[in-house]
């Protein structure tokens, strides 16, 4: 198969977007600058992996690309030894990149920043023997990961490359960049040598694990407990050291994350590959293939793929559904997401038939391994589940950061605007892959069962198992979704909720998670499985329906049915499923457990029976609102609540409705009645005004108001009406008076005008006489100008102009011109001013 598998580097996008060079997956800069084949050219591997950037080998492209690509460029950290890691760090511009990655598993001393240098000796790493060293985890951000991813030959298949490391930054905290062995993330298949440091604590795998390029031995350190797994040992023989620490839990998310192998070499995939380097987040979980690590929270590693399935991502965090879809690890040609990430877009082409055969065999192993592993995980994780909830959530959050991409293929995409949301969300399955899937269903029906919605339904009953997180079934996640407030059963998806929101962990990625944990924006679907997404949507719809009902009840049901208050038991049940990890919500338990004692009768105001909504209450949306029983008034409860909780107020309305205090309800009722009474009064007034109805009738129409004051108000209103009538009468009288006065004024004005006219004529007649001028204030000297006028002297006018303000001023000139006694002085008066 290895011979058949051809690793093709596609120059599809020669230039990494946003300055990230497409690293051809095989070459990584050695500390001494020599390119090393990431695939760890295995003796057996016939794979010819060659990196061409624009046809030229780029041995050291990674470091420079990495700097830009990811502030978490863990890339260079894939070093054989810690010293080498430092050297690689030197090459790596970003000190974070320098974080010694435990994935130094390249025999060749690949210093390349690939965290997940899944150097599978092509044969050693059978599809079944996919080994992932968590340290080797690709730092997708650094894109050295893409170079590693660049080529997964089936033999050299990075199939189980630990991409958790790819989801670095947080994983780094874990020591392996986000290499959470998802609760012993994957059981390495019988042949698989996956070194996972499930615990983020084990920052570096033992040099052996880094050196164990052979898939045969990779050290999985969980909480620094190392179990060396012989890749050839059957998975059951593999000893996992479970320390009850986050490491185990980390595996859980990864199971959810299950790297989906992009089987198709589709051009879109390739473009996607070119883009993935763009994802500056090393967090790109390879793949787009990663489901949110939380998807099952518990799908621990029961890798449906199993190492036998050479999932390019060394451990498919394998939601069974994810496994389904991505799941022919390399059916036909598969582009590993990591490969996609590598700008080289190296795709592993594998003979679908060979893969199918191997896959079938591997599946048998996987099934066995998954069962045994699951049982182990169930036992260990039952213990760890609690640990997980207490401590793992933090890790989960780190996983979310770890996979700003892992959790959300989408979040990764958003954090890096460079990535297509849809592509990252979806694994594309070639028909070959589909056929492999079918085989897988045949070979491992129990795993696929989990993928089926029916299994999901079954999973509902398995809440305990879900709590055990060891459950690898996506269905269990879904059951949790509906049944539990813990991690959203679809932790990969919708119910990520606040604990999954940890964008802080993903330095690069802002998780576009809905605060409600409904879904990452962009509707991230589990890779290849849409059933779970449907379940999520169904849950959401159910919650929304409950919301609507409650809203209606609040607004419309003034007559509050006296329902029994929510039982504390129910609240407690909800609490049980709340992740204690969610620090934000931990105080909620207190609220939940509070009896509604302060409500003194609030129970009578429940809008609807709590049971009606209770099945929704267990959904993630209702996960924690402390509001239900908070003694605060319904409106007061909003005041200090976090935004997402405030939203939950609406989501959990049925639960929150209890919050309405008796006083609040009374006020509401009073307000309503007051409004009604006012409206009725207005109506009555209108009737009275029109005379269409009598006060008595109107009073009867009024509802008996709870307030005894209404009767008095009615009488007062009558008095007011009488006063209004009186005022109207007065107004009418005044109007009449006004009209009379206006008439009088008009007549007086006419008379006055006539009088003025008469006076004017009188004045005109007598202005000719000198005595008439004396009253006008003209002194005898005026005669001199008047006499002068006879002499033809017109200069008498200026003194007259001084008096132009008075009519007499014009009259004097007329007088001056009066030499012609027979003439009216009007003409002369006009001449004078002229």
Swiss-Prot record:
The keyword Transmembrane does not apply. Keywords: Coiled coil, Cytoplasm, Cytoskeleton, Phosphoprotein. Residues 497-507 have a biased composition (Low complexity). Residues 712-749 form a coiled coil. The keyword Phosphoprotein applies. Belongs to the CCSER family. This is Serine-rich coiled-coil domain-containing protein 2. It comes from Homo sapiens. The lineage of its organism: Eukaryota, Metazoa, Chordata, Craniata, Vertebrata. The gene is CCSER2.
